[in-house]
Swiss-Prot record:
One of its GO terms (biological process) is dGTP catabolic process. Residues 66-273 form the HD domain. dGTPase preferentially hydrolyzes dGTP over the other canonical NTPs. GO terms for molecular function: dGTPase activity; magnesium ion binding. InterPro entries: dGTP_triP_hydro_central_sf, dGTPase, dGTPase-like, dNTPase_1, HD/PDEase_dom, HD_domain. Belongs to the dGTPase family. Type 1 subfamily. Its EC number is 3.1.5.1. It is an enzyme of class 3 (hydrolase). It comes from Escherichia fergusonii (strain ATCC 35469 / DSM 13698 / CCUG 18766 / IAM 14443 / JCM 21226 / LMG 7866 / NBRC 102419 / NCTC 12128 / CDC 0568-73). This is Deoxyguanosinetriphosphate triphosphohydrolase. Its cofactor is Mg(2+).
Amino acid sequence: MAQIDFRKKINWHRRYRSPQGVKTEHEILRIFESDRGRIINSPAIRRLQQKTQVFPLERNAAVRTRLTHSMEVQQVGRYIAKEILSRLKELKLLEAYGLDELTGPFESIVEMSCLMHDIGNPPFGHLGEAAINDWFRQRLHPEDAESQPLTDDRCSVAGLRLRDGEEPLNELRRKIRQDLCHFEGNAQGIRLVHTLMRMNLTWAQVGGILKYTRPAWWRGETPETHHYLMKKPGYYLSEEAYIARLRKELNLALYSRFPLTWIMEAADDISYCVADLEDAVEKRIFTVEQLYHHLHEAWGQHEKGSLFSLVVENAWEKSRSNSLSRSTEDQFFMYLRVNTLNKLVPYAAQRFIDNLPAIFAGTFNHALLEDASECSDLLKLYKNVAVKHVFSHPDVERLELQGYRVISGLLEIYRPLLSLSLSDFTELVEKERVKRFPIESRLFHKLSTPHRLAYVEAVSKLPSDSPEFPLWEYYYRCRLLQDYISGMTDLYAWDEYRRLMAVEQ
């Protein structure tokens, strides 16, 4: 196991226009302050205020959006980071681990990773992801590229069908089809930060949001040693070279994770579990009393002094005494949140320290809060009650189905852009309006400028005389559409769908 030295991980250099020379502690901190400014002032963060957390198209400002959720995750991440640093200081290990002059950057990377952790999520959350993947899967059929005879390939894009005698090109076709059918919010976050917004963050800051290490074009089983780290796609084919460079800059082995990402993940797990239940009460899906009974029933028999007693029962009893003349709802969730944080944050911090050799190496194949402990059981309790009583509620499911239909419908509306030949689409990109393509011209005009520029830049770097060129061009054209639609807010996607379907002006 490599020696733990965080100076080798907290890399303050950037992909472009990187600071040069040796830097003092204060100068390094200023570099990460610059990262903070770039992130907080980015439009992707602002758009989170109109993206779904649990309840799509919610008008009640007391119910969480992706932005308010991310701010809460940021605070919990900061709490865990400070707890870790405090414990390492008590153990006199800060200097030994190369952290004595990097405590500020350590905290900042965690905080900003937490704030950014959802920026790649499409409108309508997981149902939006499913809509994008299902739409492309129905047209590309990546499974047919694996074992079917070539004559049975149902891919509707002629250029991406496998062909006899073209094995090198066929392998690229397989990758592209698989990649486009595995849109994922975390992978889109990497693409947003690097390719679409060109934020030019430090290598360490980007490492903090690389939550999953599986390429989106991965086929087959994942290695047992990395099955948790690779349980979802983490980056796309379009960012393959960038991620390879990131691994080099952060001293990460293949499919390994950046150490501080575990803290961001734990902060998210702690935050959303309580928040989803609180939002459900705000939405009147159930009362606080009903929630307490749901939690009590799901936990089962327990003794005094158990974690359930110290966290949930304690919050319930204090809220009923109502000594602060506040509503029982507010009191209960205040105590539940405080009790949960006071138990889970120190536990997560200690798990990080206890497993630091594997975490530093990037190979710890678990979440910090997924083990056989009572703390893990408490999180599972919150999640299970939310799944049973919140996510399955008819109002939530109806809105999710509407969101799925909106995203599928928008992809269908923009499909003519994918149906154009390479030469015709190239002409449209160059001229922006082609008389014989009136519908396609108008659809192209609606695409946002940053997304169009990202497409043009990617295609301009390809050798146009290569046999791979048509495949890559079509890949980036599909990415253009995914980028545009996934970047919409819930409300914009809803309104755009209604306008283009002529439901309203």
